[in-house]
Design a protein with these regions (language model features):
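Short, amphipathic C-terminal "tail helix"
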Residues: 283-306
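Short gly/ser-rich loop at a beta-strand->alpha-helix junction or flexible surface loop bordering the NTP-binding
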Residues: 83-94
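Short beta-strand or tight-loop elements
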Residues: 30, 84, 101
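A basic- and aromatic-enriched beta-loop-alpha substructure that forms the phosphate/nucleotide-
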Residues: 116-195
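Conserved nucleotidyltransferase catalytic core and NTase-mimicking acidic/glycine-rich helix/loop elements
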Residues: 163-288
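Short, Gly/Pro- and small/polar-rich lid/capping loops
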Residues: 70-79, 85
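Basic/aromatic-rich interaction segments and small domains that mediate binding to polyanionic partners
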Residues: 1-61
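Catalytic metal-binding acidic patch
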Residues: 94-128, 216
Length: 306
C-alpha cells in the first residue's frame, strides 16, 4: 500500500540528500516541516528546513518525524507497504453518509520482525489526517478489539473492505472471537455517560451535539444486534432517515431521550439472553498474533537467504 498523503504542517525527515531552491545541499536525515503540496498524481512536497531552506521531495523520500523516532529510515519507509487490512468505517459504512461526509479508514499493519524485536518497537499506529486514515499495528488492534473498542470492531466488521492480504483475511476470519458480553459494558456504558454529558450541556448552554447523539443511538442498536445475533452490523438500514433527522436537529430532544432509554432497556434484555461468552476468545487472538509474527520472521529469514 503506498504511503498516504501528508498534510501541510507535518514534521518530516528526509530519506535522501537533495539540493534546495538555492542549490544548498540538504543531507539525509534533515528535519523540516511540509509547507506546500502540489495536487499532481505524483505529488511533490515543499519542505521548510530550520534555516529557511525549502527543498522539494517526493512522498517516498520523506518519513513522518514521529515515525522516524521509532526506527531507522530504512525500516520505516516500508511500513505503509505492510498494511494487511484497510476498511472504510464511519458514516459511509453506516449508510449515513451525506455529500459532506469524510471517508474514514481503519485497519492494521504487520510490523517487520526487526522493528518488532527492537528496543523501540514498532509504532502503535500509522496515521494520515488528510485521508482520515489510521492503521494500528496488529498487536494494538487485537488489544483494542478484545476490549470491544467500537472503532476496532467496526474495521473488522465493515462491509467496505478496501484492501486485504492473507494475514488480513485470517484476521477477518476470527472476528467473531472478539464479540462477548464486554460489548455491553463498552457500548452501553459509553452511550449512557455521553448522553448524560449532552443533557447537562443542553441544560446549561442550550446546545446539543445532534450528530453525536445520532451516532450514539446507532452504536446502541449495533451493540444490541451483536449480543443477539453474534455479529456486528454497521449499516443502519431502515433507521437511516430517522437517524439523519436527529442529526439535522429535526427531532425533539424528549423524543431522542425516549428512544435512547428504550434502547438501553433493550440492551439490558439482550445481555441477559445472549449466547455470547463472558469474555472474548483470547486464545484465538493469541494464536493469530503468533502466526503473524512467525510470518514476519520467515520473511526476514527468506530475505537473508536462510
Amino acid at each position: 500500500m503506498p504511503p498516504l498523503r501528508l498534510p501541510t504542517g507535518t514534521q518530516v525527515v528526509a530519506r535522501i540528500p537533495v539540493k534546495d531552491q538555492s542549490g544548498v545541499d540538504r543531507a539525509t536525515g534533515s528535519v523540516g516541516v511540509v509547507v506546500a503540496v502540489d495536487d499532481l498524481p505524483d505529488s511533490t512536497y515543499l519542505v521548510q528546513d530550520p534555516d529557511g531552506g525549502e527543498p522539494r521531495y517526493s512522498r517516498s523520500d520523506l518519513i513522518v518525524r514521529a515515525e522516524a523516532q521509532w526506527a531507522p529510515p530504512a525500516t520505516v519507509q516500508n511500513l505503509w507497504d505492510r498494511v494487511i487490512l484497510s476498511s472504510v468505517i464511519g458514516s459511509r459504512a453506516y449508510g449515513l453518509a451525506t455529500d459532506a461526509s469524510d471517508t474514514d479508514r481503519r485497519g492494521a499493519y504487520l510490523a517487520p520482525a526487526p522493528l518488532d524485536w527492537s528496543l523501540r518497537g514498532a509504532p502503535e499506529q500509522l496515521q494520515d489526517d488528510v485521508r482520515q486514515a489510521c492503521f494500528w499495528e496488529v498487536k494494538k488492534l487485537l488489544t483494542l478489539a478484545l476490549k470491544a473498542n467500537p472503532n476496532a470492531l467496526e474495521c473488522l466488521y465493515s462491509p467496505l473492505v478496501e484492501h486485504t492480504t492473507p494475514p488480513g483475511e485470517e484476521l477477518l476470519a476470527i472476528r467473531s472471537s472478539f464479540l462477548s458480553k464486554v460489548v455491553y459494558a463498552t457500548y452501553n456504558g459509553y452511550a449512557l455517560s455521553q448522553f448524560k454529558k449532552m443533557d447537562a450541556d443542553r441544560r446549561m448552554r442550550g446546545e446539543v451535539n445532534w450528530k453525536h447523539a445520532m451516532h450514539l443511538l446507532r452504536a446502541l442498536m449495533a451493540g444490541i444486534v451483536a449480543l443477539r445475533e453474534g455479529h456486528l452490523p454497521l449499516d443502519v438500514g431502515a433507521h437511516r432517515e430517522q437517524l439523519l433527522a436527529i442529526r439535522r436537529g429535526e427531532i425533539a430532544w424528549s423524543d431522542v431521550e425516549s428512544w435512547r432509554l428504550s434502547l438501553h432497556r433493550e440492551f439490558d434484555r439482550a445481555v441477559a439472553d445472549t449466547r455470547l461468552p463472558d469474555r472474548p476468545d483470547y486464545q484465538a487472538a493469541e494464536t493469530f498474533l503468533i502466526s503473524a509474527r512467525l510470518r514476519a520472521a520467515s520473511e526476514l529469514l527468506g530475505d537473508n537467504g536462510a
